[in-house]
Each structure stands twice: as C-alpha cells, then as structure tokens.
C-alpha cells in the first residue's frame, strides 16, 4: 500500500473557550482573595458527588481562587457545614 491510499487521521484542534471564574465578582477578582466558608451554595458547586474538591481544570478557577476555595471548603467541613464524604 502506498502512503497516498491510506487515510490519514487528522487530529482535531480544539478551540479553548475561557471559562468564567466562579469566584470573580462582575468579571473582576476580589481583593483580597477571600471565599466565605458560610457560602454553601458556592462551595457545594466546587465539590463533586463523592465530596472531593474539584480541580482547577474542571471548576474553571484560577490558582489564587482555587487556594481560597480549598481553604473555605476545609474550614466549612471542620465547622460541620459541609460533609467530608458525599453520598
């Protein structure tokens, strides 16, 4: 078989769409970066069904906001506002 007769597999180029950081307020980063541990609506979006903290790629957070979210989730777990283990 010649190389021309073979069908070439073309890799699909994905266009990355920027996810909006859920911590940002009106498109701007709050300074200082602080996530309230009592905001259970936001924190429950950052935790999956098993109770694990979602990674940056999945949640769309920047590094600074991911650190703040992680600290807030751990604080809320300690205060018994969020469960350590999910369903």
UniProtKB/Swiss-Prot annotation:
Gene name in the database record? rpsR
Question: Which proteins does it associate with, and in what oligomeric form?
Answer: Part of the 30S ribosomal subunit. Forms a tight heterodimer with protein bS6.
Q: A Pfam family matched by this chain, by name?
A: Ribosomal_S18
GO MF annotations for this entry?
small ribosomal subunit rRNA binding; structural constituent of ribosome
Q: Name one GO biological process term.
A: translation
Q: Where is the composition biased (Basic residues)?
A: 1-19
Which family does the similarity line name? Answer: Belongs to the bacterial ribosomal protein bS18 family.
Source organism's superkingdom?
Answer: Bacteria
Keywords of the record, alphabetical order, are: Ribonucleoprotein, Ribosomal protein, RNA-binding, rRNA-binding
Q: Which PANTHER family match?
A: 30S RIBOSOMAL PROTEIN S18 (PTHR13479), SMALL RIBOSOMAL SUBUNIT PROTEIN BS18M (PTHR13479:SF40)
Region of interest (Disordered), ranges:
1-25
Species: Rhodopirellula baltica (strain DSM 10527 / NCIMB 13988 / SH1)
Q: Name one GO cellular component term.
A: cytosolic small ribosomal subunit
Q: What does this protein do?
A: Binds as a heterodimer with protein bS6 to the central domain of the 16S rRNA, where it helps stabilize the platform of the 30S subunit.
Record's protein name: Small ribosomal subunit protein bS18
